[in-house]
A protein has these predicted regions:
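Glycine-biased, small-residue-rich flexible motifs in mid-sequence functional cores and linkers
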Residues: 2-302
């Protein structure tokens, strides 16, 4: 258990006007390693996700998994968007935190017991609650649980929500805490998107239309796909789209610290060709080498 005011109490949650007095914490890593090492992003939505919602939930979390600054995905361990967000985070190597509306020993719904167990065993992941042992999953608990999801996170992303859905409550808490809110738009006649459309219409949430754009707006840098495209575009303008210098740079970007000998083996080029091309990139500031001739792309480029 972590008490309010203690060193391990989550800093973002402590900033809220109504922080819980204590958090029960179940994880294989210490609290600070879970909640302070990475930016926390809440991903929430209805339990009754449409195929459109399921697809976008996965796409958004997978894009965050490719970000320059990988986040920790926070959600509520419920059916629908929550479960997909947690599982996708684990699948792509992100950490994830499940906030429960029960005592720490009781996973609700019980069908997510195995998922919660995997989260507890995975370094950097956790299951948390502010309810003491023995607390049952009553309706009021879920409203209070939602404020913790919003409070732990620098931003909240709503996948699908009805106008009276719990995800809408989470989004409103996030607004109250001066945190960013993003919402996936849906059809005007789809009740599962009515809440998201309302958030966007009232300007309580920014619209989500592109996973990679969302990653950048969340302050997580660029995705691997955009970083690669950015490097190719930059070098293409400099040397021409078909230049072998682009391939060399992409090889180095994919394997930071690769030696010139390894580049020879990977590309099939001769040693003089590799040496000459590396020298051009280094002279132009697109490549760095150390005393052992190990190559990296400068951080300012990628």
């Amino acid at each position: 258990m972590i008490g309010f005011g203690e060193e391990d109490y989550p800093s973002l949650l402590a900033e809220c006007g109504d922080p819980p007095l204590a958090l029960y914490f179940n994880a294989s890593s210490p609290p600070a390693a879970v909640l302070e090492m990475r930016p926390c992003i809440a991903v929430v939505g209805t339990r009754d996700l449409s195929p459109y919602g399921r697809d976008w939930c996965r796409r958004l979390v997978l894009a965050m998994g490719e970000a320059s600054v990988p986040p920790c995905i926070v959600s509520g361990l419920a059916f629908g968007a929550d479960g997909i967000a947690h599982r996708t985070a684990l699948e792509c190597g992100l950490t994830t935190v499940g906030v429960m509306a029960t005592g720490i020993e009781k996973v609700y719904p019980w069908q997510h017991t195995e998922l919660a167990g995997e989260m507890v065993r995975t370094p950097g992941c956790a299951v948390v609650t502010d309810y003491p042992t023995g607390s049952a999953p009553v309706a009021l608990n879920f409203i209070r649980r939602n404020r913790i999801i919003a409070g732990l996170s620098r931003a909240t992303v709503v996948i699908e929500s009805k106008t009276k859905g719990g995800s809408l409550i989470t989004a409103k808490y996030a607004c109250d805490y001066n945190r960013d809110v993003y919402a996936l738009p849906g059809r005007a006649d789809d009740v599962r998107s009515a809440g998201c459309n309302s958030l966007i219409r009232q300007r309580m949430a920014d619209i989500v239309t592109d996973p990679e754009d969302l990653v950048e707006r969340l302050g997580l840098g660029k995705t691997a796909r955009r970083r690669k495209a950015g490097l190719e575009t930059l070098l293409g303008r400099k040397y021409g789209a078909d230049s072998p210098l682009i391939r060399l740079a992409l090889v180095v970007k994919g394997r930071p610290g690769i030696s010139l000998d390894e580049i020879v083996r990977e590309t099939g080029w001769s040693w003089p060709e590799v040496q000459e091309r590396a020298a051009i990139l280094e002279t132009d500031g697109y490549l760095e080498t150390d005393l052992l001739r190990r190559c990296t792309i400068p951080a300012k480029i990628v």
